[in-house]
Amino acid sequence: AAGAKLGKQQAGTFGDAAGFSFYPTKNLGALGDGGAVVTDDEQLADTVRAIANYGSEVKYENKFSGLNSRMDEIQAGILSVKLKYLDDDNTKRKGIAQYYLNHINNPEIILPEIINRKSDSHVWHLFVIQHEMRDELAKYLKARGVQTIINYPICLPLLPAYSRLKHHENDFPIASRHQKQILSLPIFPEITDEQIKHVCNSIKEFFVEKNTYIR
């Protein structure tokens, strides 16, 4: 959500602290795994820095049970350069998302909905559609050179880590339905206009071949 706003407030300024992922596919991404914690609390910042450095503020004097979560200089340098282009890249993402919203006009497809307030700024890390024939559509698009992905294919309560709680799909009917229908379309600043059109046309062709309604 780097660069997103709710009203006049930037993402990362809600609460005592916030975390940003710098995974390569994020809006502000490094060339490998990385992330940051932001806060305006100096004491909390010192604690987080120590935890990320084996739990020590002074070498070999471990104040906390910590981790090795320090970002290396190469990744930091790359992010420093990419940060200059974040607003421009987010503007491109918004344009791509708007094209999808305007041209994927099959009523059988559930498109993402946002509250359209001028003071807010959605930065479209993902563009996720939903359809009950998700797997067939993904296979069809792949055959036409369109890479899609299923982000978070298992809802949290059904993960093996929580099997001890003995949850069932019926306990979470909405989340369980979504996990079977969600599909993320390509959205990144470098995608070309022709590639975006190809994505939309391929989706239309899929439904034409399936003899389902499409305008």
Task: Map each language-model feature to its residues.
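Short, hinge-like loop/turn segments at secondary-structure boundaries
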Residues: 10-14, 37, 166-169
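PLP-dependent aminotransferase class I/II
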Residues: 5, 40-215
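Conserved PLP phosphate-binding loop immediately N-terminal to the Schiff-base lysine helix
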Residues: 1-14, 18-21
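Short beta-strand-to-turn element immediately C-terminal to the catalytic PLP-Schiff-base lysine
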Residues: 20-21, 35-40, 80
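Residue-level recognition of the GNAT/N-acetyltransferase active site
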Residues: 23-25, 188
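Glycine-centered loop/turn positions within well-structured domains
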Residues: 9, 26, 84
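Hydrophobic transmembrane-helix microenvironments that flank and shape a buried ionizable site
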Residues: 13, 30, 69-70
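Glycine-rich phosphate-binding loop of ATP-grasp-fold ATP-dependent ligases
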Residues: 27, 31-36
